A protein has these predicted regions:
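Transmembrane alpha-helices and adjacent helix-loop boundaries
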Residues: 2-392
Length: 392
């Protein structure tokens, strides 16, 4: 495979820097000096003492080598004790340590400044005017609201996705039913009705926003309970916004998961079903023992991606009073009257949640020997599962 243009020159230059002794010393000392110059020692405290000492020691060693180089000139490699062949490899390894110390010094300055900023914001009695100071102040003083919102968001996403998975298993069985001429009229009618219901359910749910679905579910539940003669206090105890949000996420995700499972099942080789039937298994036994397990495995990446989608899409349920992360954010805004800082905090928290759960799902997919979940989108792509299955 040919190297890109310029790669050979860069490789030779890197080999020259690594092998030529004076450049290892002087180049690394320049990096150490830059790190010391950009990092005031007073702001680091005891934490920056060791990296600073290492950088100063390397600079001193490089100055000694420079003095020998100027004094000995052509005899430098032969007479200088630092330039002995046996010391070149240890010095190169020590230069890596100096680079690490220089990087630590460069990072300590901003980190120390941010820590000082956080301490000042937390100790403040009023909301600071600066953006970062105000965000830290609001995050610290509203931490109970944010913790409650994050907990509710995770509960809705986890339980809603699990419930939707089992509902999707039932609906996908109805969805893939096709009437057979050899069956009696009652069985054919039941299959047609079941498949039609699954198609209609998928069309309606996937064609309407979750925000509208949440409002319909919540107020429909209130109307049913009020029609049954329940009092308002009893209704609020039984039909809270949390339960309405959980039902909404479960019903919404069921439609998407059903299509994902259908794609995974249709990606299974039809010959396996025929082979199972030829061995004496009934249609239900062949589907349950042969086709369904493979279809579910093909669909795991897209199904796990639905959990990430639910973490983000649950934010729309705040309109019915679900105390999720978005509701907590609006509550903090109502207290401090600063929207930009609060919404930036919510964005960072959502990003952390999605990254953590994506990493966990990727590790789970590796243990199950399936493809990792793809890029996180706003909706689950039903075609993802069969496409991956055909590629494998």
């Amino acid at each position: 495979e040919p190297l890109p243009e310029g790669a050979g020159f860069l490789r030779r230059a890197a080999r020259f820097v690594r092998s030529d002794h004076p450049y290892v010393l002087l180049g690394t000392s320049a990096v150490a000096a830059l790190a010391l110059a950009c990092t005031p020692g007073a702001s680091l405290g005891a934490a920056g003492a060791v990296p600073s000492v290492v950088c100063f020691a390397w600079i001193a060693l490089s100055l000694v080598a420079l003095v020998f180089k100027v004094a000995l000139r052509r005899d430098y490699r032969r007479l200088c004790p630092i330039a002995r062949p046996g010391l070149r490899r240890p010095l190169r390894y020590l230069s890596y340590l100096v680079w690490a110390c220089a990087a630590a010094l460069l990072c300590m300055g901003p980190v120390a400044g941010f820590v000082a900023l956080c301490r000042g914001a937390i100790a403040s009695s009023t909301n600071p005017t600066g953006f970062l100071e105000s965000a830290v102040y609001m995050l610290y003083n509203g931490r109970q609201l944010f913790i409650t919102g994050v907990t509710t968001t995770i509960e809705l996403a986890l339980f809603g996705t699990v419930i939707a998975f089992f509902l999707a298993l039932l609906l996908v069985f109805l969805r893939i039913q096709t009437p057979d001429r050899g069956e009696n009229d009652a069985v054919r009618f039941c299959k047609a009705v079941g498949s039609g219901f699954a198609r209609l359910y998928s069309t309606v749910v996937r064609g309407t926003p979750m925000m509208v679905q949440g409002a319909i579910v919540y107020f429909a539940g209130l109307a049913v309970l009020r029609g049954a003669g329940w009092e308002t206090a009893h209704i609020n105890a039984v039909w809270s916004p949390f339960w309405a949000g959980l039902v909404t996420i479960s019903l919404n995700s069921t439609a998407y998961m059903m299509e994902v499972l259908r794609g995974g099942i249709e990606a299974v080789d039809p010959g396996q079903l025929e082979a199972a039937r030829s061995l004496g298994l009934s249609q239900w036994q062949a589907m349950r023992k042969v086709v369904f397990p493979q279809g579910v495995k093909n669909s795991i990446p897209a199904l796990s991606n639905e959990l990430i989608v639910n973490i983000k899409d649950s934010s729309v349920l705040s309109i019915i009073g679900v105390f999720d992360l978005m509701f907590a954010t609006t509550s903090v805004i109502g207290i401090y009257y600063k929207g930009l800082e609060a919404y930036c905090i919510a964005a960072v928290v959502y990003l952390i949640l999605t990254m953590v759960f994506s990493k966990v799902l990727t590790m789970l997919a590796a243990r199950l020997d399936v493809d990792a979940p793809g890029p996180v989108g706003s909706t689950t792509d039903p075609a993802a599962a069969p496409a991956r299955a055909r590629q494998s």
